Swiss-Prot record:
FliM is one of three proteins (FliG, FliN, FliM) that forms the rotor-mounted switch complex (C ring), located at the base of the basal body. This complex interacts with the CheY and CheZ chemotaxis proteins, in addition to contacting components of the motor that determine the direction of flagellar rotation. It comes from Buchnera aphidicola subsp. Schizaphis graminum (strain Sg). Keywords: Bacterial flagellum, Cell inner membrane, Cell membrane, Chemotaxis, Flagellar rotation, Membrane. This is Flagellar motor switch protein FliM. Belongs to the FliM family. GO terms for biological process: bacterial-type flagellum-dependent swarming motility; positive chemotaxis. Gene3D superfamilies: CheC-like. It is found in: Cell inner membrane; Bacterial flagellum basal body.
Length: 311
């Protein structure tokens, strides 16, 4: 089913964002999660078109985009090989991928060297990647990562790192992992030439699984006062507030130093980025503290209670 997502303006040209989503996508994402994904993709399209247009000094237009599950492209049957970039989502220790159409890099390279891309008509891929392709690929992947992470920041923070670049055969099974991936496929038009890229992210990135194991001191009153218990798994409750305290990982000073402390003295903290997060004075997990977009953010690294592990 095709949906028109409204009009946006880029480089004084108006275009419609047309997208098609897999019919069974609602088996994996609820309506709120799908809306979140649509907003992220819309922002990404606007950002990446501006970046690509500036990079190759030429107009680029979106044809359409699709959202599917565990696919490389909009229609995998049309291709034998793709350029593949393996990525790592550092905050969650999960993999992600970016795939390019067989003509993607050659068209960009032709534009960058003064051509119009129309000399590139083949849709196959050479077995070996050239040095120029490596350099241009890494530059473009950097653009995509920055644009996608920036598009996500209104909903969540992700830190994506480049891992590897190679060529894959689509007739071989690639998804060996148990993770489900959302395939965000974007078809573009450069000077009449169709190219595409696909961004694959784990479904768990979009899923809102912020479930906690808690119990109430008074089960008849919804209160902020909560204590942690081992066997009560909250799944469908909302509007629950927990008192969260963030503490620095303990550092140590000598008794002599302590006895001689004066106002204005400086105390060295061994690792100020490391913190312990507590609820009702009970340590819950270890994390890293960072400042992002003028906000304090804690990255969860390790639960301190085995029953709090994700299920």
């Amino acid at each position: 089913m095709l949906h028109t997502m409204g009009k946006s303006t880029n480089l004084d040209n108006e275009y419609k964002i047309i997208y098609k989503r897999e019919k069974n996508l609602d088996r994996f994402l609820d309506q709120n999660e799908m809306k979140k994904l649509e907003k992220i993709n819309k922002k990404f399209i606007q950002k990446i078109i501006m970046i690509f247009s500036s990079f190759i000094k030429s107009n680029i237009e979106l044809n359409f985009y699709t959202v599917k599950i565990n696919s490389y492209t909009n229609d995998d049957k049309n291709f034998k090989h793709l350029y593949a970039n393996s990525l790592k989502i550092e905050t969650l220790e999960k993999k992600s991928f970016i795939f390019f159409s067989p003509n993607f890099l050659s068209v960009f390279i032709d534009f960058l060297f003064g051509g119009k891309g129309n000399s590139i008509i083949r849709m196959d891929i050479k077995k070996e990647i050239t040095y120029t392709e490596h350099v241009i690929n890494k530059k473009i992947v950097g653009f995509i990562i920055d644009a996608y992470c920036e598009s996500c920041k209104d909903f969540f923070y992700i830190d994506i790192k480049f891992l590897d670049f190679n060529i894959i055969k689509l007739n071989k099974h690639f998804f060996y992992t148990n993770d489900l991936f959302i395939t965000n496929y974007f078809s573009f038009n450069l000077n009449g030439i169709k190219i595409f890229l696909s961004i694959l992210i784990p479904v768990s990135i979009i899923k809102e699984k912020n479930k906690k194991i808690i119990n109430f001191l008074d089960k008849n009153i919804f209160s902020k006062k909560t204590i942690l218990k081992e066997n009560f798994f909250i799944e469908n409750l909302s509007n629950i507030e927990l008192d969260v305290t963030v503490e620095l990982i303990p550092s140590y000073i000598s008794k002599h130093t302590f006895d001689n402390l004066r106002e204005g003295d400086v105390i060295t903290i061994e690792d100020p980025g490391k913190v312990t997060v507590c609820i009702e004075k009970k340590p819950i997990f270890l994390g890293k503290h960072k400042i992002f977009d003028e906000k304090s953010i804690i990255f969860l690294e390790k639960f301190l209670h085995q029953n709090l592990e994700k299920k």
